[in-house]
């Protein structure tokens, strides 16, 4: 009941962040070492998606809000990543946006995850395809490749973010279209001024990070 007074926008931010704390573990090199971890992660994501839709329409729905709170605890305690390594590149992208523009954390993640996913999809299209089938219940079309199904899964995730009124571009985030200088500054900050790469699933250097920021710059 303590959640009932939350602004609708902050509920949406919470839904996205809970999803991201699991997705940033779900997509990692080699994947978790056992099926159980995947099953827990996929079940949590489906639950948050369903409860999120309800909560965004009725923030006083006790059942929906309790599901979100419970999922938040499980998503943040590393249960959904046991046996694997954390990627968390999208969180790094988001932190720099929040630092430069005072944007809400969850909102930066809904902008950056679809762009990151499209940029790295060829690292493991089968993993993204499985995500689409297991979480979004997508059915593979006749002759559809892993990559095509993977892109459909990414699009479906982005559509969900829009459906709960979360931003998916810089303009929707409220910061407008950025200059090339601003994009380069974001990439520099994200790499600690060219001293590190970001992520484990597909490690990204300055050029890769800049490319992902450019994809969101609309």
Model region roles, listed by residue range:
Residues 8, 37, 201:
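Glycine- and other small-residue-rich loops at beta-strand/loop junctions that grip anionic moieties
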């Amino acid at each position: 009941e303590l959640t009932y007074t939350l602004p609708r926008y902050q509920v949406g931010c919470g839904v996205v962040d809970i999803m991201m704390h699991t997705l940033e573990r779900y997509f990692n090199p080699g994947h978790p070492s056992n099926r159980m971890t995947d099953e827990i992660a996929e079940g949590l994501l489906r639950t948050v998606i369903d409860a999120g839709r309800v909560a965004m329409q009725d923030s006083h729905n006790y059942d929906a809000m309790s599901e979100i709170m419970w999922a938040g605890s499980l998503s943040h305690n590393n249960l959904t990543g046991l046996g694997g390594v954390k990627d968390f590149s999208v969180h790094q992208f988001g932190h720099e946006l929040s630092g430069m523009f005072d944007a809400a954390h969850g909102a930066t993640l809904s902008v950056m995850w679809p762009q990151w996913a499209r940029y790295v999809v060829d690292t493991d299209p089968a993993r993204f395809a499985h995500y689409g089938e297991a979480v979004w219940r997508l059915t593979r079309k006749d002759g559809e490749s892993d990559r095509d199904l993977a892109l459909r899964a990414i699009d479906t995730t982005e559509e969900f973010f829009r459906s709960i009124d979360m931003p998916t571009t810089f303009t929707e985030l409220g910061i407008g279209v950025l200059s090339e200088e601003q994009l380069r500054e974001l990439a520099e900050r994200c790499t600690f001024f060219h001293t590190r790469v970001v992520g484990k699933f597909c490690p990204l250097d300055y050029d890769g990070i800049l490319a992902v920021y450019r994809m969101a710059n609309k």
